[in-house]
């Protein structure tokens, strides 16, 4: 058990009480590992063994804050240029009254 951190140790201890929660924390609650562990928990001991296996096999991943990383060379901020309003050329569109001149409620035969 190399590179077992304090959080891994606490998850292993917690897996003796609620192993499916440990698998949900480590792998996600909508994953196949979570559903497998729920089925194994019905059998008892295999659910605990599976939860300990998941904690050891999949170490905690470090989530990087990509948006607020000032030293990352792959993330560059480029400001958008000001959008200039182009002059409108051509005739004005027709008004609604010229398009809908007759009343649509009364239809003539």
Curated annotation (Swiss-Prot):
GO terms for cellular component: fungal-type vacuole; plasma membrane; vacuolar membrane. It is a multi-pass membrane protein. Its main location: membrane. The modification Phosphoserine is found at residue 69. It is found in: Vacuole membrane. Keywords: Meiosis, Membrane, Phosphoprotein, Transmembrane, Transmembrane helix, Vacuole. Residues 75-109 are annotated as: Disordered. Has a role in meiosis. Belongs to the UPF0057 (PMP3) family. This is Plasma membrane proteolipid 31. The gene is pmp31.
